[in-house]
Amino acid sequence: SAFQTADAAICAAAVADYTPATPADHKLKKANERLDRIELVETVDILAELSRQKGKRCVIGFAAETDNVVEYAERKLARKGCDAIIANDVSRADSGFGTDTNKAWIVSTTGTQELPVLTKPQLADTILDLLQNL
């Protein structure tokens, strides 16, 4: 994978937490096949897997939270084994999905830093600065 030759990985979103246990090999037609339920299985946790393989490389993950933002990010950091979590408070009108700004905290193995409300490009620059210091 590309991570083998990378200096760092920034995992900005979970690709999918679950996937169908038995994917269909054809389009399911509404008229022909009744779909009562879809059995799901957990997918590989990419952030945790990259963190296990990181060696001296840096791995940063994200957490979109609506409450207990820092506490949940600290738990995620410990659980995943990455170098830092960028925790976004998506309960705010000026942060997260569908906005141009984010209210975030950097939660790392060396401590927690609350950031002001930043534009997404400003937050990206802050994350790149963080990478240089990890």
What positions do the PLM features span?
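Glycine-rich phosphate/dinucleotide-binding loop and adjoining beta-alpha-beta core of small-molecule
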Residues: 1-94, 105
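Small-residue (G/A/S/T)-rich helix-start motifs and N-terminal tracts that mark the onset
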Residues: 1-8, 82, 89, 94-134
